[in-house]
Amino acid sequence: MQTDGHTSGAAEDPLVAAAKAGDKLRVKQLLEEADDRCQGDRKDPTAAFAAALQAFHTEIADTLLRLGAQPADVPPEELPSLRQAVDFGSPALVDALTHSSIRHRYPRTELNAMRDLARAWHEAGTEAELRRRTGSSDTIARTRVQDDEYCTVGELTLAGTTVRDGHGAILTHLEKMLGIRTSCQELVARALERDADHTAWSRAAIELSHRRQPEAWATAETLRADADPLRRLFGAELTRLFEVFADSHDEEYCVLAVAALTDWATAETDPTVLAEVLHGLSSYQGPRAEAALLLHTHHHVPAVRRAVAAGLGTPPHSRQPSDAAHQALLTLMNDPDTDVQIAACHSAGDIANGDRALTDTMASLLDHPERRVQLQAVHALARHHDERCVQAAERLGPPRPGYREDETYYLEAAWRYERPREDTSPG
């Protein structure tokens, strides 16, 4: 649990101070500035990683870990204890403390005790256990926070004590570390206690999808047929992950998943579930999958159209989309929803065959008021070897401070396209 006064305000290295303050944008800016000064030799983010963990800023710690922080270089006394992390209820904090490089620091007896602690929180309920520990009957302040790069959790504060509601996800993680095989039914129950953005949901889905066995597949099939759309939504994600984590397109459960999603796409009526189903078809542009996607090109819910746009591309071993897919991409690049436009432009870029109708529509997006659309259009045009990407990239300028990693991905395609032209120009 985190209590008021957890952190100190001592002056420190700017990167460490930014991590301790929870300023993610400043952390990224400082790392970029250090890269510039060192000509590409990235500043070691390990001390900032430790500071972020000490302050329970888990999303920043997750970012720093991805950017090269070395948990093994941090002494145990400079990190929160595993008990503190479990009590706090942050799956990301527990993940960081049990990173593969430092997992040996925890004997099995301690891991068993932490599993029992997580189970106690989970079974009691976060609110009830927080009230029991604080002895307060005051109103609980609730918010939703980003726990790691991908997932959110609930955060509750009462009587100066703050906890997160990720104990179910922590329990799943510790059980896996200990080699305990949790039943499919229990994992589904933990997921459905939360929503689709919560770590408990994604962790249960990933764990189940890695079980390439009849019991796990039967669980997905049962959820697909459920009357409750929330249960169907979890079933759709689970089915999609059976495909995502397949070793090959020919793997048994991959084939089953694609067939199930294709049939499901023609019958699902709930827009949220339908969007998840369609996302599962994005790797397969065969005739049946494409037909299932095209059926929903003009769906009234943007999330569904976005899934269609993301799924339409080229069939395997070809750079020529079908006429219907080609027309749908042109339509979706002019969609009123910005995210649909971006997804369609990305798929059109994947075709990379210089199609004039596609590239002209992409070029029209260079005048879009949002920078993220312009970036996607630059990248897509570069993939089609369309010289309009060069001037567009120049107009956009360098990546913005704090966004270099993301924006460089889009802009460097135009830079790569321009270099051969410069090398062959007379001079």
Region roles according to the model:
Residues M1-A10, V188-D195, E207-L208, L223:
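TPR-adjacent "capping" and linker segments in tetratricopeptide-repeat scaffold/adaptor proteins
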Residues S8-A17, Q39-A51, D73-V86, Y106-W121, ...:
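Ankyrin-repeat boundary/"N-cap" motif
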Residues D13-K20, T46-A55, L79-F88, R115-D116, ...:
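Structural detector for internal amphipathic alpha-helices that build alpha-solenoid repeat scaffolds
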Residues D23-L31, H57-R66, S90-T98, T126-E127:
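Ankyrin repeat structural motif
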Residues A34-D36, G68-Q70, S101-I102:
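Ankyrin-repeat C-terminal turn/loop position
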Residues D36, I60, A72, I180-A189, ...:
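Amphipathic alpha-helical scaffolding segments comprising HEAT/armadillo-like alpha-solenoid repeats
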Residues A227-D228, T269-D270, H300-V301, P336-D337, ...:
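Short inter-helical turns and helix N-cap capping residues of alpha-solenoid HEAT/ARM repeat scaffolds
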